[in-house]
Design a protein with these regions (language model features):
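Short alpha-helical donor nucleotide-sugar binding micro-motif in glycosyltransferases
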Residues: 49-54
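A charged, aromatic-enriched C-terminal amphipathic alpha-helix characteristic of glycosyltransferases
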Residues: 120-151
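Short alpha-helical segment that forms part of, or immediately flanks, the ligand-binding pocket
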Residues: 48, 70-75, 89, 93
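Short hydrophobic beta-strand element within catalytic cores of glycosyltransferases
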Residues: 79-84
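Conserved donor-binding/catalytic core segment of Leloir-type glycosyltransferases
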Residues: 1-15, 21
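Aromatic "clamp/platform" in nucleotide-sugar-dependent glycosyltransferases that forms part
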Residues: 61-62
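A short alpha->beta transition loop at the rim of the catalytic pocket in nucleotide-sugar-dependent
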Residues: 55, 75-77
């Protein structure tokens, strides 16, 4: 079976789409069994449908936060590669360093090849990302966080 890889850039320059395409092309030339799907100008519903059947998501490679698409990908149990880095963006939860494969723009090919060569790592990152998304980005998690902030600041008891 092929490994389905999705990239859904809202802005192809900011998301590193040219790097993604070059990496995918090189892996195809090397005969990796992959299905690459690039989704541009698609509704969120279409993107979410693709995420349900995807293994790896190539998010964005010039930013230091996961963004909504990164969270949606993790919540759909995909292994995510992106440049979001909690050592740079210190506002990210500390357990985020293991939730996705931190990938600088010059590492897209190498890190994607690493996952394809080590399929057990795809599942490992998918599991960690899924747990991370549901720990930090549900209505319940947001409610707990807001209540904690309000209590810590004496607004509510």
């Amino acid at each position: 079976d092929s490994i389905k890889i999705v990239h859904a850039p809202s802005n192809s320059i900011n998301k590193g789409t040219q790097l993604v395409r070059a990496s995918i092309k090189k892996l195809q030339i090397e005969k990796y069994n992959i299905e690459y799907v690039e989704l541009q100008n698609m509704s969120n519903q279409v993107v979410l449908e693709h995420l349900k059947s995807s293994h790896i998501v190539l998010n964005q490679f010039y930013t230091f936060t996961p963004g909504l698409f990164g969270i949606e990908a993790m919540a759909n149990h995909c292994a995510v590669l992106m440049s979001a880095d909690p050592s740079i963006e210190t506002g990210l939860p500390q357990d985020s360093k293991d939730a996705w494969l931190i990938t600088k723009y010059w590492e897209v090919y190498d890190n994607l090849k690493y996952l394809l060569d080590n399929p057990e790592k795809i599942k490992q990152y998918a599991d960690r990302g899924y747990d991370f998304a549901y720990k930090h980005y549900t209505y319940e998690a947001a409610s707990e966080y807001i209540n904690k902030v309000l209590k810590d600041n004496g607004v509510i008891e």
